[in-house]
A protein has these predicted regions:
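A feature for loop-to-transmembrane-helix boundaries and adjacent hydrophobic helices
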Residues: 1-258
Length: 258
């Protein structure tokens, strides 16, 4: 059994506080950008375009992530407190919302440059698990998105929450949705179907959705929502939607290769 009493503030500079959660976004985006350019992108022209594309990705993550949280997780509150939507520093981001934002911005960027949007989405899918890893570690440090009660020897007591030992669900997600998924995608990049733009994006959606869907059974539901349908959380319902889309996309691209 372990105790979590981490300070969510990484360091302070003058009067500014730099929080682990904000730094996780910065580390994730920088690591993804470096990996994409050095390992996953072979075409020099695409490498040049990718520098501009990163700006679109950042906007997609921030705008989509925030709007996703507002719409999917706390709509009633934000309808009554409209200006709170813009206070991102108070927390409240949705991975699925950020994912939708990235998809929209990728399509926009690709059309602007007359490219196939799936080419960009496959690159992002290949490095996204690194960002997910950093994000879930930050969730753990912040004592948020914590798990249900457990008697297992690796249970964690989140001192900022209560005296109960809980599943470190953030660490489960960091491992499965982050590290393991990263290596799964590297494996599938070698498949012949990976030559078809969109195949890797589908693989990412499938495995991310499966991992998160089952881990959420060990995670406390969002306090303001609880369980939404048949003891399923909002995150699990969104995972089912993305799993269906990812399966369709993967099969479509696989059949095309055949």
């Amino acid at each position: 059994m372990f105790i979590n009493n981490f300070d969510p503030v990484a360091f302070s500079l003058f009067s500014l506080e730099f929080r682990w959660y904000s730094l996780s976004y910065i580390f994730g985006i920088l690591a993804g950008w470096v990996l994409a350019k050095r390992i996953f992108i072979k075409d020099d022209n695409l490498k040049e375009k990718f520098d501009d594309y990163i700006t679109y990705i950042i906007l997609g993550i921030i705008i989509g992530g925030r709007l996703g949280y507002v719409i999917f997780y706390n709509l009633d509150y934000y309808l009554e407190n409209i200006f709170e939507i813009f206070k991102i520093w108070n927390g409240g981001m949705s991975f699925h919302g950020g994912l939708l934002g990235v998809i929209v911005m990728s399509v926009w960027f690709a059309k602007k440059h007359n490219h196939n949007s799936y080419v960009y989405l496959d690159i992002v899918s290949s490095v996204a698990p690194i960002g997910i890893f950093f994000g879930r570690i930050a969730n753990f440090i912040n004592s948020e998105l914590y798990g249900k009660e457990t008697t297992l020897p690796w249970g964690i007591k989140f001192e900022k929450i209560d005296e109960i030992y809980r599943h470190p669900s953030q660490l489960y997600e960091a491992f499965f949705e982050g590290l393991l998924l990263f290596f799964i995608l590297i494996y599938f990049r070698k498949a012949s179907s990976a030559k078809n733009p969109g195949f890797l994006s589908g693989i990412f959606l499938i495995f991310y959705s499966v991992f998160r869907f089952f881990i959420e059974f060990l995670r406390m539901p969002d306090e303001q929502l609880g369980y939404v349908l048949f003891k399923l959380s909002m995150g699990q319902i969104l995972c089912l939607v993305f799993f269906i889309f990812g399966s369709y996309l993967t099969l479509k691209k696989y059949d095309h290769q055949k």
